[in-house]
Every structure is written in C-alpha cells, then in structure tokens.
From Swiss-Prot:
Entries under PROSITE patterns matching the protein: RIBOSOMAL_S16
Name of this chain's protein: Small ribosomal subunit protein bS16
Family note: Belongs to the bacterial ribosomal protein bS16 family.
Domain of life from the UniProt record: Bacteria
Length: 82
C-alpha cells in the first residue's frame, strides 16, 4: 500500500522532515517513490516551514495513496493557506 508520510532528516534535536510517497512496507527513512515537499517544525522568522506540491499529493491520493495523520493535517493547513 502506498502512503504519503514524513521521513525524518536533520541533526539531533533539530528535526527536518521530507514529505515522501513510499510503499508502507519500506522503512520510514528508507526507499521512497517521490518527494512531494518538506516540513520544518523549527522554522523561525523568514524561514519556510512547509512546502508541499499539492498537485502531486492530489495525484497520488487519486491513485489510491493514503495520508498519514500528520501529513493529512499539513495538507489541510497548506490548502487553507493557498
């Protein structure tokens, strides 16, 4: 089953997440099909906290991909901001 989920990157105590489309059987930070954005929870000031390609997200959801709980909330926030 294909899911759109967060893959953690960054340094210790400085999380940075790639939003990826991946097979649910693969490891959380392992192989993925496509990157569709990023999420930086520690963004301050002028730093970009969220970038999401909503066209690609909608494409994958149309193909049957499921969203993780956190990504679903981020997509909702991105759609509200757009």
């Amino acid at each position: 089953m294909v899911t759109i989920r967060l893959a953690r990157h960054g340094a210790k105590k400085r999380p940075f997440y790639q939003i990826v489309v991946a097979d649910s059987r693969n490891a959380a930070t392992g192989r993925f099909i496509e990157k569709v954005g990023f999420f930086n929870p520690t963004a301050q000031g002028q730093e970009e906290g969220l970038r999401l390609d909503l066209d690609r997200v909608n494409h994958w959801v149309g193909q049957g991909a499921s969203l993780s709980d956190r990504v679903a909330k981020l997509v909702k926030d991105a759609q509200k901001a757009a």
